[in-house]
Structures are given as C-alpha cells and as structure tokens.
Amino acid sequence: LPYTYNRKCRDLTSDEMSENKDFVIRFKSKIKGKSILEDIVQGKVEIENNTIEDFVILRKDGSPTYNLSASVDDHLMNMTHIIRGDDHKINTFKQIQIYEAMKWDKPLFAHIPLIHTIDGKKLSKRDKASTLDDYSKIGIMPDALRNYLLRLGWSYKDLSLIHI
C-alpha cells in the first residue's frame, strides 16, 4: 500500500508548532463527506474525503509542491479546462480543495486514459519516440497517428477509421 500521512500534526497547538524546527506546511483536507468531480470525459467521479491526506503544499525549504503550484498557476492564467491523464485524478481532488479554500472559480477537468508502451509501461517523454517528428522518422504516417490518438478510450459505433 502507498504511504498515507497519519495527520499527527493536524491539530497541534501554537506551542507544539513552535517546538518543531524542521517542518512542512500541509493543506488541512476535508475529512467528512465526499468530494465530487464532474469530469468532462468520465462523468461524475466521487471520492471519500477521508481518503485525501493532509497534503504538503510547502516543503521544508519553503518551495511550493506540485498541487499548490499547479492550482495557483492555472488560476492566474485563467485556465478554463484542465486535461490530464487518469494518474492525476487524485491531484485534481486536492486541487479542487485549494480552489474552494481560495474561493476561486474552478476550471473544468477532463481525465483521459494513459498511453502505454508495448511493454505495458506508461508512455513518457523519456521514451525514444515522444515527439511527432520521432514518429515520422520511424515511418508512422500522420493520418494513422491521428486516427490512433482519436480512438484512444473512445470509438464511434464500429468504425476503425475516422476521417477528419
């Protein structure tokens, strides 16, 4: 099982907090109820709030973590739609709590299936072919790649080819 923070510092007194020299800043997540994500692709997705840990938003050195940075950046850039892989869904629930705490309008979220290599690992920019030019160099035709990407996680009736 993955590590989950046990919330031991969630309700420290001011005196207890001042005793700690090394500390991080955590977001105090909701514990009761459910959070609901209206995902553009997957529809209504629910999660029990007690499964979302009090997550770190500032490291010991004061630098922000991904969830805080992404939320602030997306808000300041007036992002209306966030499209990302399924593996970031738990981050979305954390970011929604940040948006709600800051009283910001939330963008719309879409989570799409990951693309995997022939070995079953998720495709990464560190893999050999990661740009359109790379695929062109190994002989993948643009229309074939476009058709493949269009059909990932979706199909229309029984069509194997979609003409754009």
Functional labels for PLM-detected ranges:
Residues 150:
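Substrate/cofactor-recognition hotspot
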Residues 162-164:
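Conserved small/polar residues in nucleotide/adenosyl-binding loops
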Residues 133, 138-140:
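Glycine-rich and small/hydrophobic secondary-structure elements
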Residues 1-125, 131, 156:
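Active-site cores that bind ATP or allylic diphosphates and position pyrophosphate for catalysis
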